[in-house]
From Swiss-Prot:
Entries under InterPro entries matching the protein: Class_I_gatase-like (IPR029062), GATASE (IPR017926), Imidazole-glycPsynth_HisH (IPR010139)
Record carries keyword Ion transport: no
Main location: cytoplasm
Function text: IGPS catalyzes the conversion of PRFAR and glutamine to IGP, AICAR and glutamate. The HisH subunit catalyzes the hydrolysis of glutamine to glutamate and ammonia as part of the synthesis of IGP and AICAR. The resulting ammonia molecule is channeled to the active site of HisF.
Superkingdom to which the source organism belongs: Bacteria
Known EC number: 4.3.2.10, 3.5.1.2
Protein name per the record: Imidazole glycerol phosphate synthase subunit HisH
Subunit (UniProt): Heterodimer of HisH and HisF.
UniProt source species: Burkholderia mallei (strain ATCC 23344)
Keywords: Amino-acid biosynthesis, Cytoplasm, Glutamine amidotransferase, Histidine biosynthesis, Hydrolase, Lyase
Recorded GO MF terms: glutaminase activity; imidazoleglycerol-phosphate synthase activity; lyase activity
Length: 213
C-alpha cells in the first residue's frame, strides 16, 4: 500500500517544488498538496513548508483552519518542517515577536552578522543565500545515505535555537555555528531546502517517505 504524504497548503511555501521533489525521490509515494484538515488527518505523513516571514506564515496557518490538524498530526505522524516550517515548530520568533506552534521548546533569532567580515574579506550578507555544509550531530534515519558535511541550499535571515541541545540534528557555520536541522521523536525539520539541494536533498526526502519513528 502506498504511503500518503500531505503537503500543507496554507498559502505560504514553495509547494509545487516540494511535491515534485518528493515524487522524484520516491515515485511510489502518494503525494498531495492539501488545504483541508481532513486531508491532513487522512495522510500517513505530513510536510509543513514555509517561505517568507514567520509572522505571515503563522497568521496564514491560523486563518487557513489547518493549524489544529497540523498540531494533531505532530503528535502521532512523521512530520517534516522545511525552512520557515521548521521555525514555526518552536515557541517564539524574534521576527515580529511571533508566537510559534510550541511543538519544540526554543526560539528563533536573527543572524547578528552586521559588519563582520568573512575569511575572504567580504562582509557577511543577511539573508544567507546559497550552498552551505550541514554537519550531522546525531545519527538519524533521515541522514541515511547523506554524507556528513554535505552541501544543502539555504535562504534565510533567522534560525532556530532549541532549548534542548539534544534536539539539534545538524549544524552549519555562517559567521557562527547555528542549528540547521532538528529532530525529536516523530518530528524532523530543516532550515535548508531539500527540494533545492540536488541529490542529497532528494535522499533526505526519500528517507522521510520510508521513516517509521
Amino acid at each position: 500500500m502506498k504511503t500518503s504524504i500531505a503537503i500543507v497548503d496554507y498559502g505560504m511555501g514553495n509547494l509545487r517544488s516540494v511535491a515534485q521533489a518528493l515524487m522524484k525521490a520516491e515515485p511510489a509515494a502518494d503525494v498531495k498538496i492539501v488545504d483541508r484538515p481532513e486531508a491532513i488527518r487522512a495522510a500517513d505523513r505530513v510536510v509543513l513548508p514555509g517561505q517568507g516571514a514567520m509572522p505571515d506564515c503563522m497568521r496564514c496557518l491560523g486563518e487557513s483552519g489547518l493549524q489544529e490538524a497540523v498540531v494533531e498530526a505532530s503528535r502521532t505522524k512523521p512530520l517534516l518542517g522545511v525552512c520557515v516550517g521548521e521555525q514555526m515548530l518552536f515557541d517564539w520568533s524574534a521576527e515580529g515577536d511571533t508566537k510559534g506552534l510550541g511543538l519544540l521548546p526554543g526560539k528563533v533569532v536573527r543572524f547578528a552578522l552586521e559588519g563582520r567580515l568573512q575569511d575572504d574579506g567580504s562582509r557577511f550578507k543577511v539573508p544567507q543565500m546559497g550552498w552551505n555544509r550541514v554537519r550531522q550531530t546525531q545519527a538519524h534515519p533521515l541522514w541515511d545515505g547523506v554524507p556528513d558535511d554535505a552541501y544543502f541550499y539555504f535562504v534565510h535571515s533567522y534560525y532556530v535555537v532549541p532549548d534542548n541541545p539534544a534536539h539539534t540534528a545538524g549544524e552549519t557555520l555562517y559567521g557562527d555555528v547555528f542549528t540547521s536541522a532538528v529532530a525529536r521523536d516523530n518530528l524532523f525539520a530543516t532550515q535548508f531546502h531539500p527540494e533545492k539541494s540536488a541529490e542529497v536533498g532528494l535522499r533526505l526526502y526519500r528517507n522521510f517517505v520510508h521513516w517509521n519513528p
